[in-house]
Curated annotation (Swiss-Prot):
GO CC terms of this entry: nucleus
Role: Plays a role in development of both male and female reproductive tissues.
Gene Ontology molecular function: cis-regulatory region sequence-specific DNA binding; DNA-binding transcription factor activity; metal ion binding
Full protein name: Protein tesmin/TSO1-like CXC 8
One Pfam family hit: TCR
Sections of the chain in a coiled coil: none
Subcellular location: Nucleus
Ranges for domain CRC: 64-185
Phylogenetic placement of the source organism: Eukaryota, Viridiplantae, Streptophyta, Embryophyta, Tracheophyta
Organism: Arabidopsis thaliana (Mouse-ear cress)
Keywords on record: Developmental protein, Metal-binding, Nucleus, Zinc
Amino acid sequence: MTGNADSGKIATEKDPRKLVFTKLEVSPVFRESPVKELPLFPPISREHSEAKDKTDEEGITSRKHKGCRCKQSKCLKLYCDCFASGVVCTDCDCVDCHNNSEKCDAREAAMVNVLGRNPNAFSEKALGSLTDNQCKAAPDTKPGLLSRGCKCKRTRCLKKYCECFQANLLCSDNCKCINCKNVSEAFQPPAFSAHNSPQVYRRRRDRELTEWNSCPAPLFSIPDNSIQNALGSPMSCSPKLPYRKKRSLMGYTSTLLPDLGDLCSLLVAASESATTTAEDQNRIFTKPDDKEAIELSSESESRNVEEEIQSRGRLIELIDVQYNGEEDSQCKTKTSVNETDIYMEQERAVLETFRDCLQKFIKSRLES
């Protein structure tokens, strides 16, 4: 018996694994214990899930984004992200918080006060957005959007700097972002982000202004009198405008070449002097003609008045027609003659001054 016992001990020492597996196969503990009765989750997680389901039934959603840090508002104003989105503060760094389930009265009073001033204060800032499947199922429904919108320029609304991205929202028409990518493929607003940005608006406005300026003005908008005066007026009005010199591209002007600005100013001055002399001569010669015309018109008026004394209205009309017709015809003939004389004098003076300038330039060129 002692020999058998010693042989069993030696066997266990030599091959322990074999004996262990045989014991596990024979052991009734593992056969009788069912695996389904083992708890898969700790009891803390169950309580948390049950509390979460209760809060969802009551209408209070759990907060998933970054908590607030209010210190003086007691989390009862729209400055607080939790209160503005209709969420109870959980795991926030706020001080003296009233936005919780313990102080529901103060929270409801603050919400009533805010809704009295702005009925859409909380509906426009509701957290959460629709998924692609929800958008396909109901394409007419829009997700909760921020009322003021973001103003991102470089992040493309894909970082936490963007208010919409931080709140898990899609960018809306109110946003003024550029190159935005915070948009779902199923739902895209008609006029979106970059289209309403100030830079694009300025470009569109400048393009419209250039097109409007490039279009010629319609003829009916310009009165006929202004066109006739502009065409019939002599060149005497041009010298009054100041001439502005332009610098050369190289930064200096050559001493040999004549300056175009000085040459133009000389020609304009010559034409102005010619117009003044021609107008003075016309005034001197037209004085006796004017007197004769006035006498003739007075005689014709007196004859018409004596003949048509019975009808006063007709008399006035006839006098006006005759007087205006004679005056217009005389003025037209005089103005046409005077204008031709003025143009001839201007041309002569300009050509003479230009000839003198060319002679001086040729002499200076030959001397150099």
